[in-house]
């Protein structure tokens, strides 16, 4: 889950309460959050608070305290009031990131202790979460008083872009950005989002001053400071719902004196952002009480809803109309509102009772069968390895063309899902070269393969792999173990000639046939695989499909 790090004094100032750590922890717990830690940083007491992944509005101290003040009945939460503003943005390009939403915050207070840092940190949190590391949403905030309207959102070739990046010492052009921000830097990791495009999207004002180059960096010319009073906010991305939601989240947490909409002109099309949805749900008191097992009155249900930041009107003596404020983007269904009522009621206030039904669980046959295979291989003298499902492209040396590739890997070590268990066993050997040889290792686990017939485009497959690694490959070691294993399964098996140069030495491998069906292969490991993992020994291994073996086993029994 995301973590909010907020200064204790900032929290107390926003709540208007002098809370001790224990009292604050209890309030958070009742609200459904957890105070992870209290630490001292540079002489300041900081709270580390775990935030649910879908509550983007709680990722800054301001948003959290808006929610807590409503929860503690200190005030009724008010939705953002957006007035029609005068700023116009002409969209004449930017097809690389086609979705755009803008707004103006006037009279914002960034001078209060911790406010400016919180404003910047919240943008980073939104980039990381709802923006998926800026791939879906990126944002820029600018000092409105430094901008000469109207604003233009357009595209230019890199060589025609010249501007001074935020806090940079000199001006650069688009082609220099790659060297100015190398891939390992904080900003450089976002260059991959646009570097393949012929043109880069940018914002500029009527004087030709470049304001930002989304999703990379803002310009130094329009940067904000703690003294900034009026802020122009621009959001771009590939999903308008996320772009519009991120804008409303930022506006909801940092409201200033007034919020103004911005007119977006795209040819003959004119729209104003942010787009407010003002969703509402009609809920019956009986529905609420049946779901929660309570006997709430209408006034109690209404009060609970208001404590969770919703506006509520009474339709009749048993029905409520609940208006969900746009900042509560996590509410998707009536069940979310019922959950909010449960939180406000207090989970510790529910009566505990045993369920009126009883069910007996049972182990999934595939898992039960896998455990039996583990037991047998352990008896044969093999040690079990438990390796990671993710690995690098370079390490995924077997069936790499069938690999599921991660879009935004955190590390080069976790780029794809494994298509074989062998790389994991090889990495285990490579990490234990100081141990006595030979190595006898096995693993029973899932691989992930592309699958067009599956709705998510991929599927898991349970595999069993065993490896012998030493001065000589000793193919007879793994072949004998596999034959004994299949004999104990009570299935008829044989081997047929098979050449797979990616896995095995030429003429040193075979298909494993069980009841006339191929379930895997066995052979002497290709030395190139050993070299890839820097293993200075020879090896032999087998890898079989456990699901196929189980289906044959169950058909016989």
Swiss-Prot record:
It comes from the Eukaryota. Its cofactor is Mg(2+). GO terms for biological process: phenylalanyl-tRNA aminoacylation. Residues 276-352 form the B5 domain. GO terms for cellular component: phenylalanine-tRNA ligase complex. It catalyses: tRNA(Phe) + L-phenylalanine + ATP = L-phenylalanyl-tRNA(Phe) + AMP + diphosphate + H(+). CDD domains: PheRS_beta_core (cd00769). It is found in: Cytoplasm. Gene3D superfamilies: 3.30.56.10, Bira Bifunctional Protein, Domain 2, Phenylalanyl-trna Synthetase, Chain B, domain 3. InterPro entries: aa-tRNA-synth_II/BPL/LPL, B3/B4_tRNA-bd, DNA-bd_dom_put_sf, Phe-tRNA-ligase_IIc_bsu, Phe-tRNA-synth_IIc_bsu_arc_euk, Phe-tRNA_synthase-like_B3/B4, PheRS_beta_core, PhetRS_B1. Mg(2+) binds at residues 330, 336, 339-340. Its EC number is 6.1.1.20. Keywords: Aminoacyl-tRNA synthetase, ATP-binding, Cytoplasm, Ligase, Magnesium, Metal-binding, Nucleotide-binding, Protein biosynthesis. One of its GO terms (molecular function) is magnesium ion binding. Tetramer of two alpha and two beta subunits. PANTHER family: PHENYLALANINE--TRNA LIGASE BETA SUBUNIT, PHENYLALANYL-TRNA SYNTHETASE BETA CHAIN AND LEUCINE-RICH REPEAT-CONTAINING PROTEIN 47. Belongs to the phenylalanyl-tRNA synthetase beta subunit family. Type 2 subfamily. This is Probable phenylalanine--tRNA ligase beta subunit.
């Amino acid at each position: 889950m995301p973590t909010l790090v907020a200064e204790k004094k900032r929290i107390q100032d926003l709540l208007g309460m002098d809370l001790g750590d224990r009292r604050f922890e209890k309030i958070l717990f009742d609200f459904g959050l957890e105070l992870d830690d209290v630490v001292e940083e540079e002489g300041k007491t900081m709270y580390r608070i775990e935030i649910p992944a879908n509550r983007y509005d709680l990722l800054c101290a301001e948003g959290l305290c808006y929610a807590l003040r409503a929860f503690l009945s200190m005030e009724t939460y008010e939705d953002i009031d957006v007035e029609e503003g005068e700023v116009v943005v002409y969209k004449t390009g930017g097809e690389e990131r086609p979705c755009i939403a803008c707004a103006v915050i006037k009279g914002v207070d960034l001078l209060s202790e911790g406010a400016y840092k919180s404003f910047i940190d919240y943008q980073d949190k939104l980039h990381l979460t709802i923006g998926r590391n800026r791939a879906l949403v990126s944002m820029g905030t600018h000092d409105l008083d430094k901008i000469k309207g109207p604003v233009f959102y357009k595209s230019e070739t890199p060589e025609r872009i010249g501007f001074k990046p935020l806090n940079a010492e000199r001006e650069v052009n688009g082609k220099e950005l790659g060297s100015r921000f190398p891939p390992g830097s904080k900003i450089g990791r976002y260059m991959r989002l646009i570097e393949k495009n012929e043109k880069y999207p940018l914002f500029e004002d009527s004087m030709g001053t470049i304001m930002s180059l989304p999703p990379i960096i803002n310009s130094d010319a329009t940067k904000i400071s703690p003294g900034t009073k009026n802020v122009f906010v621009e959001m771009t991305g590939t999903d308008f719902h996320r772009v519009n939601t991120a804008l409303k989240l930022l506006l909801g947490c940092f409201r200033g004196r007034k919020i103004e909409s911005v007119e977006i002109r795209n040819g003959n099309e004119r729209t104003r952002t942010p787009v407010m949805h003002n969703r509402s749900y009609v809920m019956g008191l009986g529905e609420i009480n049946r779901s929660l097992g309570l006997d709430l009155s209408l006034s109690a249900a209404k009060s609970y809803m208001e404590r969770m930041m919703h506006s509520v009107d009474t339709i009749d003596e048993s029905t409520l109309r609940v208006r969900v404020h746009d900042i509560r983007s996590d509410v998707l269904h009536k069940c979310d509102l019922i959950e909010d009522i449960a939180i406000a009621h207090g989970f510790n206030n529910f009566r505990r009772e045993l369920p009126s039904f009883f069910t007996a669980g049972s182990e999934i046959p595939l898992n039960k069968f896998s455990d039996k295979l583990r037991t047998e291989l352990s008896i044969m003298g093999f040690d079990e390895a438990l390796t990671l499902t993710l690995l690098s492209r370079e390490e995924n040396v077997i069936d790499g063309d069938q690999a599921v590739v991660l879009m935004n890997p955190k590390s080069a070590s976790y780029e794809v899902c494994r298509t074989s268990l062998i790389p994991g066993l090889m990495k285990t050997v490579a990490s234990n070269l100081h141990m006595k040889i030979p190595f006898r290792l096995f693993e029973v686990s899932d691989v992930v393969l592309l699958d067009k017939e599956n709705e998510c485009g991929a599927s898991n497959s349970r595999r069993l792999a065993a490896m012998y690694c030493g001065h000589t490959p000793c193919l007879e070691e793994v072949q004998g173990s596999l034959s004994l294993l299949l004999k104990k399964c009570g299935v008829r098996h044989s081997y047929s000639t098979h050449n797979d140069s990616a896995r095995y030495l030429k003429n040193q491998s075979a298909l494993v046939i069980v009841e006339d069906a191929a379930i895997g292969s066995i052979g002497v490991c290709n030395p190139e695989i050993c070299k890839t993992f820097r293993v200075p020994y020879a090896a032999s291994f087998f890898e079989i499909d456990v699901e196929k073996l189980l289906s044959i086993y169950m058909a016989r029994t």
